[in-house]
């Protein structure tokens, strides 16, 4: 269950280091209805969401946009519910997630370690089971690195621009659906590999 009501319950007692949000508005409604109705997402804190502060990973840079980025607007028009902003390092320029003036999210798989970056807050939210999916962006690994670090699914779509918009999800099927492909029934998960298979092997 990834409803807003369940999210409220799951957030109870969690610290910002544990949930990876820089801002929350769980009462926010989507601007339309469509194929994404029922999906509850966060937006990476490099992207503008109307009515929410954008910090760009540094509280000294905070501003309040009058409108959302085009990608976020499109998600909301399709019925997605954007309920907050996910943590990112300043300007998304690092492969950790240590924003200036804000809490640093913790890796759910390896407490005390970085979740990777720059979409680290998004990966934390999905890996902890708070969200089914979270908006992310990738120029040089910013979706793929935190997804790998937190044991979730990250995909950088092909595009002409260096930085592209995408998602971190729990399953490949969810990622494909959010990118416009038909929904398929995910196969049962047999196991999750969290350690290298041959970590103790000798290297000649």
Where are these regions (language model features)?
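Short, well-ordered alpha-helical
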Residues: 1-64, 91-93, 198
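Short, flexible coil/linker segments at domain boundaries that flank nucleotide/cofactor-interacting
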Residues: 36, 161, 185-187
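Gly/Ser-rich, acidic/histidine-flanked active-site/gating loops
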Residues: 41, 47-50, 77, 180-204
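Short beta-strand segments
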Residues: 42-44, 136-137, 156, 193
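Activation segment
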Residues: 50-51, 135, 143, 201
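Short, conserved glycine- and acidic-residue-centered signature motifs
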Residues: 54, 64, 68, 118, ...
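Residue-level marker of alpha-helix boundaries and capping positions
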Residues: 62-63, 112-113, 201-203
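Short glycine/serine-rich loop segments
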Residues: 68-179
